[in-house]
Regions:
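Long, low-complexity, acidic Ser/Pro- and Gly-enriched intrinsically disordered regions
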Residues: 1-99
């Protein structure tokens, strides 16, 4: 297994724990956190009621707009969904998968 595969496996396992310290440490080992992986982290922040959630949510929507062909209506939709996390995760995953 490559070191990146190993790092990504650790990251995936950390997400299942919901432990933000483990998640942050594992994410720091990755060369880049994908938009979908960033959403997974955002969902954990929402579940935990973490005070960093709002800023992280704004950054995530910004990434959505720059990394996908999303437009203004998608941005409004994404903001509405992000405010309802973790309930609307599937719809947000769908937006993140657009290429």
């Amino acid at each position: 297994m490559t070191s990146q595969g190993s790092a990504y496996s650790r990251f995936q396992r950390s997400l299942t724990t919901g432990n933000l310290q483990l998640i942050e440490a594992a994410a720091a080992e990755l060369p880049k956190v994908s938009l979908e992986d960033a959403l997974a982290i955002l969902i954990v922040l929402a579940q935990r009621g973490d005070p960093r959630f709002e800023r992280a949510a704004a950054r995530w929507v910004g990434r959505l707009l720059t990394e996908t062909p999303a437009g203004l209506s998608d941005a409004r939709f994404a903001l509405a969904l992000v405010e309802r996390l973790p309930a609307c995760r599937d719809a947000l995953h769908g937006l993140a998968r657009r290429r």
